[in-house]
Amino acid sequence: MRQALHALLLASLSLPTMAAPHALEEIVVEGRKTPLLGLARSASEGVVGAEDLALRPLLRPGDVLEAIPGVVVTQHSGAGKSNQLFLRGFNLDHGTDFATWVDGMPVNLRSHGHGQGYTDINFLIPEMIDQLRFVKGPYHAELGDFSSAGGVHFETRRRVEAPTVSVSAGSNGYERLLAMASRAQESVLTGALEAVRYDGPWRDVEENLEKLNGQLALTRETEAGRWRLHARGYQSRWHSADQIPARAVAEGVLHPLGALDPALGGRSHRFSLGGDGTLRTALGVWTAEAYVIDYRLRLWSNFTYGLDDPARGDQFEQLDDRRMAGGQGTFSWGEDQPLTQRLGIEVRSDVIDNVGLYRTVARQRQEGFRDDAVDQTSVALFYEGAFSLSPRWRSVFGLRADHYDFSVRAADRLNSGGARESQLSPKASLIFSPSETLEAYLSIGRGFHSNDARGVTLRIDPQSGNAADPVDPLVPSTGGELGVKWSPRPGVNSALALWQLDLDSELLFVGDAGNTEATRGSERWGVEFNNFWQLTPAWRLEVDLSWTHGRFQGNAPEGNRIPGAVPFVASSTLSYAPSQGPFATLRLRHLGAYPLAEDNTAKSRGSTLLNLALGWRWPRLRAQLDVLNALDAEDHDIDYFYASRLPGEPEEGVEDLHFKRFEPRQLRATVTLTL
């Protein structure tokens, strides 16, 4: 690994300084400074720029998602695994109802070995993010699968102003090296390389995270448009300390930072090629994006210890090995007319050679529960029209049609088969602008998420051998939002939104078990209040509040609370960032207590986390110290409530709180040199 770090450093130093080409104009992304008045289609959408992200101390790459107001990022496993996400009363698991895209490539993985919509953004290099554009709710025609709660588009930097090398070291064996550079003539060639090592603070397991990450892009811009070709490569391996039972800690058997199974962890890679382009013609604007992706994950977990197999333990492996290809094209016209229109098409094909679930001991396979191959294809057409009704009124209306084909070749032929399903999703917004500083929005729409193809064709439970009911291929949702955006002066903006989202009842495929379970329909509504103040040219403050009420529909005997539905989230970021000299950022995040059981008898107590970054900036040098979990809080990063079995416990196990603690306070120092 250290040899790789040295090679990366030498490679970065060999890149020449970029000369700015005449064909590329400078684009300044204002991020949260930009109120989007006159542009937004709903009150809760927004933009976060590179400047916003650069000020944040980050424990892991996934933490960049917390720049979206109301989003909470946690981790119940190792540093190489996808994060657990919370938004608008959803425990999104690893991304089921939140769509994520990077440079036109989808990140959510359908029919994934671990969980539907699995979203792993560990391949993102935070310093290479130019901006992220986010929306919430199912009101936007360009977003389809997994977007009921919202979605985000990451756009990475097309050029780096000067070659840059960044070296980091910190607590628990943390090491990181990053190199970025561009070379420009008629086209701009931009590359970045990253290497990371991390052992973690856990008592019984060293994470031994080793990650290599790189991206390369070639961009050319002309008067008529712009095109880009890009390539990415990411691979990592790690060990993990997963969530642990609270009773073992209370009895002194296990340390709060301990682990019961030292052989957990994973290996993953993601390689991609892609391209995108924009062409302006007399008729309108054409855009196109295309990609191919090679992805693989092997993940070892153990959540119940000895509940299913007291002799060998309950460790299991999940495998996902796939190729993806697809793209999107749009045509927009009427830019200077009262009616601006956009027509788009989106296609995607997932060829999954092997998606499996196996019983293991110390990572060695003992038997298989699922060993399948899946082909899943989707085609979508969408239309959106924005009509200026008067100087104060405008409307946006859209319609999206999605069609899915599922094909499964299962080890058990009874679970093989195919299915087709279509979904029509109307969207609409009405916007009123009483002044140049204020807009009010009313938005409604229909969305959906797809289900795991293995659940769509399921006939026999692979563990019990009993008959099983298949899941619905597509599960619809319906939502609405009423809100306002207000920007009384440049650098000050606020957004207030009252929203509701209903999901149909469904049978859900459980990737950890290979079977299905019934879930009831749900209703969620809430209020969000987001604020940004540029107090002075150097000082800025963000305060975001989110409150949610979530319940299952009906009055079942077991109760109607939604496990993992967080009722309150608050976050605030205070930054001092002059162009040179000292700088500092203080970031506070509070996650309110939330139910872990439908009858509300088990609850998470919530958590509060404070991170600090401080440093000094010179013309070509920057030194920064991150203090993560600055108060050394012992709160839980995430909580679950379920039955597990330890040695000597009854056959049916013990229902208990299972948690993963915050990582203790740690320091990370970074020196960045601009050549």
Mark where each language-model region is.
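Short strand-turn segments of transmembrane beta-barrel domains in outer membranes
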Residues: 136-141, 150-183, 193, 202-203, ...
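Gram-negative outer-membrane beta-barrel transporters
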Residues: 331-334, 395, 404, 493-503, ...
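C-terminal beta-signal and adjacent terminal beta-strands/loops
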Residues: 593-597, 616-675
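Face-selective signature of the C-terminal outer-membrane beta-barrel domain
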Residues: 221, 226-234, 266-411, 431-433, ...
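Extracytoplasmic beta-strand/coil segments of soluble accessory domains associated
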Residues: 62, 66-109
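Short acidic/polar hinge/loop motifs at secondary-structure boundaries
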Residues: 106-136, 154-155, 471
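Transmembrane beta-barrel wall of Gram-negative outer-membrane proteins
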Residues: 171-197, 203-241, 263-285, 333-335, ...
